[in-house]
Amino acid sequence: MTTMFFNLLLAFMVALMGVYIYREHLMSTLLCLEGMMLSIFIMVSLTLLHHHLNSTMMFPLILLVFSACEAGVGLALLVKTSNSYGTDYIDNLNLLQC
């Protein structure tokens, strides 16, 4: 394993640990999820470039599209909870159920 892949794996693990530690606050969780998606995107892109897999070069782009959708839904939930309750605690998300 090269140093770059080790650093990206370490960045993913730190972001995963951040999701676990800051799971009460939605904003911190969203930032950690974005860090995880960014490290996965870079790892997938570098792996595809390293192995010269030109037929699968659309996978990183698809991953970015899903990451943008995840960020949009997360920010919509953040705006809804902060406008309704004045805080970004995830415990308030149970109150949004129909």
From Swiss-Prot:
EC numbers, comma separated: 7.1.1.2
Membrane topology of the entry: Multi-pass membrane protein
Catalytic reactions of this protein: a ubiquinone + NADH + 5 H(+)(in) = a ubiquinol + NAD(+) + 4 H(+)(out)
Keyword Membrane among UniProt keywords: yes
Regions that span the bilayer: 1-21, 29-49, 59-79
Location in the cell: Mitochondrion inner membrane
Keywords per UniProt: Electron transport, Membrane, Mitochondrion, Mitochondrion inner membrane, NAD, Respiratory chain, Translocase, Transmembrane, Transmembrane helix, Transport, Ubiquinone
Record Pfam families: Oxidored_q2
Signal peptide: none
Chief location of this protein within or outside the cell: mitochondrion
Keyword Nucleotide-binding: no
Recorded GO CC terms: mitochondrial inner membrane; respiratory chain complex I
First-level EC class: translocase
GO molecular function terms attached to this record: NADH dehydrogenase (ubiquinone) activity
GO terms (BP aspect): ATP synthesis coupled electron transport
Family to which this protein belongs: Belongs to the complex I subunit 4L family.
Quaternary data: Core subunit of respiratory chain NADH dehydrogenase (Complex I) which is composed of 45 different subunits.
Function: Core subunit of the mitochondrial membrane respiratory chain NADH dehydrogenase (Complex I) which catalyzes electron transfer from NADH through the respiratory chain, using ubiquinone as an electron acceptor. Part of the enzyme membrane arm which is embedded in the lipid bilayer and involved in proton translocation.
Protein name: NADH-ubiquinone oxidoreductase chain 4L
Organism field: Zaglossus bruijni
Encoding gene (name): MT-ND4L
